Amino acid sequence: MCTLNEKSKLDVAIDGADDVDTNLALVKGGGGALLREKMVEVMADKFICIVDESKLCKGLGPGFPLPVEITPFCHEHTVRVLENLPSIKGSCKAVLRMGSSSTN
């Protein structure tokens, strides 16, 4: 095992997803490690996502809340911007789920 700081590239990254639609678009990061997962995937030449049929859906969104990881810097502004996006204004509310704790 090694850390990502020790490698500049990975051959393959393997992970799961929270939701997968019929176009193979994914919702990931529901467990709270969105940024960490993305960093690993970006460093990999190949990304393999393994899911079972319980993760399949007709469209992303209704079955699983969209995870958005926000860093502490300028977090209040970021939440305001997200809450006021025209496509979701009034239909969603940002919920602080994990506070400032570190996960995974």
Region spans (language model):
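Conserved phosphate- and dinucleotide-binding cores of soluble alpha/beta proteins
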Residues: 1-104
